[in-house]
């Protein structure tokens, strides 16, 4: 058996096509969705991520609002930029690129984001809304995972799902999304304190790995035919001395799984598509 690859790039492209239509409809009402980014410092990796987000914006017709500050920007300067974006009617959502320089209070910065303009869907208020089942921006990566599975006709209702990783960005909110009545999956949230991890993953129809541990999920840890989602991304140094990114799923899993969301080309493009979706939805709400 060789796993069917669930292509996040192709699915994200379909979503962008749909967003273009929605953005055009907004334009007919005189509304242009706007995504803001706040970048402090000149870290090449962070700059690349931000540039990618703005390329995505250009592809679907979303306006870009870039706010860039030097690495030595004060807390007050950063706070002022966030206050400006919170008040700007042209900004329907924005993100603060992490990590921030050490002298800045990251938690303070993130909590200053207007929850209605929280494009990442990770503001404490919006996570609380998710817990309570209230509408609000959804966390991009978990939402992207659910959307990718749904669009590939992976049955979620009644499915046994093992989520490996309890981070606030993926694992915890993903469990909340999957247990909504619209999905109705049964979720086991595994983590570093889980005893006999393999017992939980082998019992699952769907295994989603977001632990940041290269090659954590091996072929013997899943039931043949299971759906596997690789969310992990870790930079490792290969035998040639060159750096490369690898996921949490051992390559041999492709010979056992029924379907695989790979890394790269799986969850990453979906996360970016969901960021745009959150912004467009905010613009549609007015």
UniProtKB/Swiss-Prot annotation:
UniProt entry keywords in alphabetical sequence: Amino-acid biosynthesis, Histidine biosynthesis, Hydrolase, Methionine biosynthesis, Multifunctional enzyme, NADP, One-carbon metabolism, Oxidoreductase, Purine biosynthesis
The keyword NADP appears for this protein: yes
Catalytic function, reaction form: (6R)-5,10-methylene-5,6,7,8-tetrahydrofolate + NADP(+) = (6R)-5,10-methenyltetrahydrofolate + NADPH; (6R)-5,10-methenyltetrahydrofolate + H2O = (6R)-10-formyltetrahydrofolate + H(+)
One cellular component (GO) term of this entry: cytosol
Single Gene Ontology MF annotation: methylenetetrahydrofolate dehydrogenase (NADP+) activity
Binding sites annotated in the UniProt record for NADP(+): 165-167, 192, 233
Xref: Pfam families: THF_DHG_CYH, THF_DHG_CYH_C
GO biological process: L-histidine biosynthetic process; methionine biosynthetic process; purine nucleotide biosynthetic process; tetrahydrofolate interconversion
Entry EC no(s): 1.5.1.5, 3.5.4.9
Pathway the protein takes part in: One-carbon metabolism; tetrahydrofolate interconversion
Residue runs in coiled coils: none
The protein's assembly and partners: Homodimer.
Annotated family: Belongs to the tetrahydrofolate dehydrogenase/cyclohydrolase family.
Functional description taken from the UniProt entry: Catalyzes the oxidation of 5,10-methylenetetrahydrofolate to 5,10-methenyltetrahydrofolate and then the hydrolysis of 5,10-methenyltetrahydrofolate to 10-formyltetrahydrofolate.
Protein name per Swiss-Prot or TrEMBL: Bifunctional protein FolD 2
Source organism (scientific name): Salinispora arenicola (strain CNS-205)
Designated gene of the protein: folD2
